Structures are given as structure tokens and as C-alpha cells.
UniProtKB/Swiss-Prot annotation:
Phosphagen kinase N-terminal domain ranges (all copies): 3-85
Binding-site positions, ATP: 116-120, 179, 223, 274-278, 302-307
Family label: Belongs to the ATP:guanido phosphotransferase family.
Residue intervals of the Phosphagen kinase C-terminal domain: 113-349
Keywords associated with the record: ATP-binding, Kinase, Nucleotide-binding, Transferase
Name of protein: Arginine kinase
Organism: Liolophura japonica (Chiton)
GO biological process: phosphocreatine biosynthetic process
Catalytic activity, EC: 2.7.3.3
Length: 349
């Protein structure tokens, strides 16, 4: 309790924090939740630790485990509504659309604008906690279960699993050059126990073509990524959905009817789907109203090296903004229409 009282003191006494934690963890909510515990052993302290230690956080709240979304709903509910800009905690059933009739293919057959296309989702095991409530043995066990499912993949998805622990320098160098490797450098995740027991239990799986990639125990239990050079969104999306469906046969993923798929950070909930292109748009990006254009199309633009980075040579990472309150196929269609509009504007500029 001393730990929690200290964290609460940090958050409540800070006048400058703009985080959603600061905004929604009122004295009343704190008093109501401070003694509660999830079946995974998760506490309010686990949920707010990162935001209290990093008062410049945007969100500042992580879920201690899948059950935290129910037990600590008085804090997490308002944070979710606020972050996702929705009016009620409601999410449709999972719907990937009719894969044989998507109505779209390659955005950019000429190859003039789109450098690469990528779609990812996050998934959590229903029976394991999130980083704050896991111990070393559980991390190892979760990796074992996930690795078993991944190594059973066949056809185009067939590949190899590389644990981070004991990885040779050669493999490490190759994966870093491929931009496949994740590291332990995010201070927000670190404060949220995201890197406890690092690198135990973490690893990377990818297929022979390096177009299907799975991160194990990075931020989320599982991040499934499909990607390739060029603009063939349909091929990338179908591969991703195929991979998800195969893994679902062997693993049970955490989901709530009103929130969709559960993730460690409430910002990824819902479809958890982020569809993005690296796209050359030097002219549109120079327009003073560029951000406004993206907002109107429900797109997010950032530099190609991830969040908070600048563009290199007019190449931007453009992705769908909305994760909650719409289905997977709706999220993909929204991104497709938005990117088509951006290409049209670039051509006309």
C-alpha cells in the first residue's frame, strides 16, 4: 500500500501533468479502487506506476492483466473513452470481411508513391497476466506455448522462431538491419514492468520471405505483423488474417464484448489493428493544412522510424487512427480510402 499511496501522491500533487491518468484518477476513483485486486494479483499501483513515474505521459495507464479492464473499470473506462474519442464503451464483433471479395488490391501498381505496406494486430493470452503481474516462469511458459503454435504454421507462413535470450551477435545484427528487432529502451514501458526479466521469454518469429513476423512478449504478449514492399494492401491483409486464424486454432485470446481484443495499453484496444504505408508525399506534406487533411481522413502521419520521428526525404508513415468502435474490415477500408485520397492530392499538387 505504501507503494500505491506514494504513486497517488505523485500524480495528485502534480499540477503540470496532461496525462489521461491525471485527468481521470480523481480522489473518489482512487478511494474506490485502491484495495481492489484482480485474479492475476493485479493492483491499481500496477496500472498507474508508469504514469506516476513519467508525469509527461500521454495516457499514463496500463492494464495489469486482462481482468483489470473489469476490476479497474472506473479508471480505465473513462481513459478509454477519452483516448479513443468515443461516447460509449461499445465494440462490434470481429469481422475481417470477405477475403475473396475485398474490393481493393494494389494501391500503387506503378510503384511511384508507396514504398511498403504493413498491417499489424496485438493479441493477449486469456490465461496470462500482462507484464506487471508476470513472473519469470510465466514468461518462459507463455513463450513456450506461443512458440509451439508459431512453429506449427505451414505454407507461406512457415518460418522460424528466434528467442532473444542467447541470440548470437550475427543474428542480432541481421535482425537489426532488417528493422525486425525490438529492444528495451522505452522508459514508459520500463516503468510499467514491460522489461522485467529482460530478455527472458521474448522472441521473434518470421517466415522465409520475411513478410510475416510475430513479436513475442514485446509490449503485448503477441504482435502479428504482415508486410511487404510496394502497395498491395490486399495481399498484406489476407496474409495477416490467415496467420491470425491459424493461431486462433491453438491459442485463446483475451477479448471483451464491449472492448474488443485486450492489450497491455488501453490505446491499442478494439481491433488492435494498425494498417500503414510508407509513402512518398513531399508536396502534400508541405501543405500547412497537412495535419488537418490527415485528421479529416482519420489517418495518423509520422516519420518512418516510428512515433515522434521526423520524415526522411518526404517519406511518411501513414496509418489508420481509429482502433475502437469499428470492425477490422472497416478500419482497413478507412485507411485505404484515406491513402487513395492522399495520393490523389499528391498527384494534383
Amino acid at each position: 500500500m505504501a507503494d500505491l499511496a506514494e504513486l497517488w501522491e505523485k500524480v495528485s500533487s502534480n499540477k503540470d501533468s496532461k496525462s489521461l491518468l491525471k485527468k481521470h484518477l480523481t480522489k473518489e476513483v482512487y478511494e474506490k479502487l485502491k484495495d481492489k485486486k484482480t485474479k492475476f494479483g493485479g493492483t491499481l499501483a500496477d496500472c498507474i506506476r508508469s504514469g506516476a513515474k513519467n508525469l509527461d505521459s500521454g495516457v499514463g495507464v496500463y492494464a495489469s492483466d486482462p481482468e483489470a479492464y473489469t476490476v479497474f473499470q472506473d479508471l480505465l473506462g473513462p481513459v478509454i473513452l477519452d483516448y479513443h474519442k468515443i461516447t460509449e464503451l461499445k465494440h462490434p464483433a470481429c469481422d475481417f470481411g470477405d477475403l475473396s471479395n475485398l474490393g481493393f488490391g494494389d494501391f500503387d501498381p506503378s510503384g511511384d508513391w508507396i514504398v511498403s505496406t504493413r498491417v499489424r494486430v496485438g493479441r493477449s493470452h486469456a490465461s496470462f497476466g500482462f507484464p506487471p503481474t508476470l513472473n519469470k516462469e510465466q514468461r518462459v511458459e507463455m513463450q513456450r506455448v506461443t512458440q509451439g503454435a508459431l512453429e506449427g504454421l505451414t505454407g507461406e507462413l512457415k518460418g522460424k522462431y528466434y528467442p532473444l535470450e542467447g541470440m548470437t551477435p550475427d543474428v542480432q545484427k541481421q535482425l537489426t538491419e532488417d528493422h525486425f528487432l525490438f529492444n528495451d529502451s522505452d522508459r514508459f514501458l520500463k516503468a510499467a514492468s514491460g522489461y522485467d526479466d529482460w530478455p527472458t521469454g521474448r522472441g521473434i518469429f518470421f517466415n522465409d520471405n520475411k513478410t510475416f513476423l510475430v513479436w513475442v512478449n514485446e509490449e503485448d504478449h503477441i504482435r502479428i505483423i504482415s508486410m511487404q514492399k510496394g502497395g498491395d494492401l490486399a495481399a498484406v491483409y489476407k496474409r495477416l488474417v490467415g496467420g491470425i486464424k491459424e493461431l486462433e486454432k491453438k491459442l485463446e485470446f483475451a477479448r471483451l464484448p464491449n472492448l474488443g481484443y485486450l492489450t497491455f495499453c488501453p490505446s491499442n484496444l478494439g481491433t488492435t489493428l494498425r494498417a500503414s504505408v510508407h509513402i512518398k508525399i513531399p508536396k502534400v506534406a508541405k501543405k500547412p493544412e497537412f495535419k488537418e487533411i490527415c485528421d479529416k481522413l482519420n489517418l495518423q502521419a509520422r516519420g518512418i522510424h516510428g512515433e515522434h520521428t521526423e520524415s526522411v526525404g518526404g517519406v511518411y508513415d501513414i496509418s489508420n487512427k481509429r482502433r475502437m468502435g469499428l470492425s477490422e474490415i472497416e478500419a482497413i477500408q478507412e485507411m485505404r480510402k484515406g491513402v487513395e485520397e492522399i495520393i490523389k492530392l499528391e498527384k494534383a499538387a
